[in-house]
Amino acid sequence: MESSNLYSKLLNAPKNAPVFLSQNLEADFIVKAYTFGLFPWTSKPVTWWCPDPRCILIPNQIHIQKNMKKFINLYQIKLDYDFLKLITLCRDTRSQSWINDEFITTYYKLFTQGYAHSLELYENNELIGGIYGLILGKVFFGESMVSIKKNASKVAMIKLCDLLKPYDFIIDCQVYNQHLEFMGAHNISRKEFLNILKEKCNQESGFKNFKDLIT
C-alpha cells in the first residue's frame, strides 16, 4: 500500500480499537509501522493500534515535582547496557503483560539493529528500573517502563528528557494516563501526530550512538 493511501486510511481508522491484526511480529515491519504511528499491543494475535488522541511528551516541557528532586541523582544511569534484561523485567513485574517471548525476541533484534534502545537505572549494580523504546529520526517511541524501587520509572523519564532536550525530539507515550500527565505529557490529535511523524522520522537524530549520550 502506498504511503498516501495508508495515511488516509489511518485518519479514518477506529479511535480506540485495533487498526488491524497480524499473527506474527517482524522487526522490519515494526520499523515501518512506527513511522505511521502504529504500535503492537497484545499478542496472539498481535493487535496494531493508532489511537486518537495520541499522548506525547516534549522533553523540554517535562514537569519535575518537588518531591522527585531527591531521587533524580539517587540511581546510576546506563544506556543500552542490558536491553534484554530490562525488557524481561518489564514483562516479569506485571501480572498480565503483552510482552511475551516473541515480543522480547523481536525487540531484541531491533536492539541489535540499532533501532531499539534502553535507559536503565541501577542501585548497587542491581537493575531497579528504566524505559525502552525505538528511536526513528527525532522521535523516541516509548514502549514500556518499569520501577522496582520508588519513583525509578519517573527518574528514567526525567533522565531521558534531559538527554534528548538538545536534539529537538518528541517522545511518543502512546496512550494517556494520569502519571504521564503529571510529568508534562499531553494529548494531540492523531492527524497532528501523523504529520509530526512525517517530519520528525525523516530527520537525523543529531547523535551517532544513543549509548554515548552519557559517559
Swiss-Prot record:
GO terms for biological process: protein catabolic process. It catalyses: N-terminal L-lysyl-[protein] + L-leucyl-tRNA(Leu) = N-terminal L-leucyl-L-lysyl-[protein] + tRNA(Leu) + H(+); N-terminal L-arginyl-[protein] + L-leucyl-tRNA(Leu) = N-terminal L-leucyl-L-arginyl-[protein] + tRNA(Leu) + H(+); L-phenylalanyl-tRNA(Phe) + an N-terminal L-alpha-aminoacyl-[protein] = an N-terminal L-phenylalanyl-L-alpha-aminoacyl-[protein] + tRNA(Phe). It comes from the Bacteria. The keyword Cytoplasm applies. Pfam families: Leu_Phe_trans. Its EC number is 2.3.2.6. One of its GO terms (molecular function) is leucyl-tRNA--protein transferase activity. GO terms for cellular component: cytoplasm. It is found in: Cytoplasm. InterPro entries: Acyl_CoA_acyltransferase (IPR016181), Leu/Phe-tRNA_Trfase (IPR004616), Leu/Phe-tRNA_Trfase_C (IPR042203), Leu/Phe-tRNA_Trfase_N (IPR042221). The keyword Cytoplasm applies. Its main location: cytoplasm. Keywords: Acyltransferase, Cytoplasm, Transferase. Belongs to the L/F-transferase family. Functions in the N-end rule pathway of protein degradation where it conjugates Leu, Phe and, less efficiently, Met from aminoacyl-tRNAs to the N-termini of proteins containing an N-terminal arginine or lysine. PANTHER family: LEUCYL/PHENYLALANYL-TRNA--PROTEIN TRANSFERASE, LEUCYL_PHENYLALANYL-TRNA--PROTEIN TRANSFERASE. This is Leucyl/phenylalanyl-tRNA--protein transferase. It comes from Campylobacter jejuni (strain RM1221).
